[in-house]
């Protein structure tokens, strides 16, 4: 675990130009934080909506904002923050612009770990490093603005210069990390993909929907089912679990809630662990990567994805949420 020493980071990176390729949530959050802390950072984009957003955020064309290939050629640390599909598409150009002793930086191990599918294999004369914030790009930015920072993992995949660790850790704090813990590219991507499919998103949606449907099938109104399934969890209990831990929550709830949670948690553990183990195996085997890459390469993928997302959007559960969220006290 490392604590931030920002002046030391500035010294390490004083002769570096960080080129951020991509301006999605991570590119934007990391770039703005680096700029605010006085590091030399440029953005590389194709002209379009992301380019316009970058201009609105104060990046200056020809000074700190360049087209992707130009930025790649100017950078000494290339932060490769395009989507997984975008990284595959742009890799030949990026590889051609890597110079000896450059650093290639990722915030996700997908491209490197699943190189058989992505074809992303860096040359041996560059550092290959990773900093993976444990939150969305928006959280990277808002935590930094609040003076908190965000926890991040870091990894060294290839140390061609002997300076990869220093460059990695300095950049981690430059983007707004508060604390760091070491991992590997493999462990990062395996845990990240499993988390997204399970407790962070996939399983969470499934669990919310299952409880909501049971309550509705037994006569509860949409508002009651939503409040007891989602609103209380997200607005009251989960923030306390984050702040104090589940052990504290168990010790500070009603005796009825305490007894029920203690009795039912093992049943959920027994039911869910095999599903999570199946998911983890699918991730580590490369099956999930293959599914993602093959899906993204289909001509009609975007159209079908929009249909899937619209189906979630139209679920009664989330329609109830849209009606109830404006009624929170802070919104009245």
Language-model features: where?
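NAD(P)-binding Rossmann-fold cofactor-contacting core
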Residues: 29, 35-59
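Small-residue helix-packing motif on alpha-helices
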Residues: 51, 71-72, 87, 222-226
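Rossmann-fold dinucleotide-binding core
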Residues: 105-197
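Active-site-proximal catalytic alpha-helix in oxidoreductases
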Residues: 162-217, 223-241
